[in-house]
Amino acid sequence: MTVFEGNLQDTRDLKFAIVIARFNDLVVGKLLSACEDSLRRHGVAVGPDSHQVDYAWVPGSFEIPMVARQLALSGRYDAIVCLGAVIRGQTSHYDHVASEVAKGIQALAFQTGVPVTFGVLTTDTMQQAIERAGIKSNLGWEYGENAIEMATLTRKIRHLVAVRAVQPELPEQTPPSLLQ
């Protein structure tokens, strides 16, 4: 049996894109800061001169899936992080936006094979959103870690598929050392 598992260490050659919604920037800015901190602490070069992280700013969360799809199809990224916040208001707008964003992000991961982290908060109140992007607990950190883990996991799986294509005689129970 082969066991596949991502890790948080092999980040030196990984390339990430972060798609950030400007709407609800009070919350989204905090998610972005924590996500960047997570990536940085796991060895990813983050910042204006980074060769590992690119940023795409969009007006709101509804626009995230389209831009993330274009980035995924470019073939340049090992993972994409989508950051936004959809907060319930007085109309049904929230239900439509939250649902379509979630579906769009999930669909593009399936269609492109590029891991896409769903970092769009969907909350009933601004207070709930602030709590999820706050000092005590900030989900942005987890979104960064999830992107790293999924990028390293899919890289291992792709490597095994490529090795098996060249060496079909490899046993089904390939030792983990061959998957590195």
From Swiss-Prot:
Transmembrane segments: none annotated. It comes from the Bacteria. Keywords: Riboflavin biosynthesis, Transferase. One of its GO terms (molecular function) is 6,7-dimethyl-8-ribityllumazine synthase activity. It catalyses: (2S)-2-hydroxy-3-oxobutyl phosphate + 5-amino-6-(D-ribitylamino)uracil = 6,7-dimethyl-8-(1-D-ribityl)lumazine + phosphate + 2 H2O + H(+). One of its GO terms (biological process) is riboflavin biosynthetic process. Its EC number is 2.5.1.78. SUPFAM superfamilies: Lumazine synthase. Belongs to the DMRL synthase family. This is 6,7-dimethyl-8-ribityllumazine synthase. The lineage of its organism: Bacteria, Bacillati, Cyanobacteriota, Cyanophyceae, Gloeobacterales.
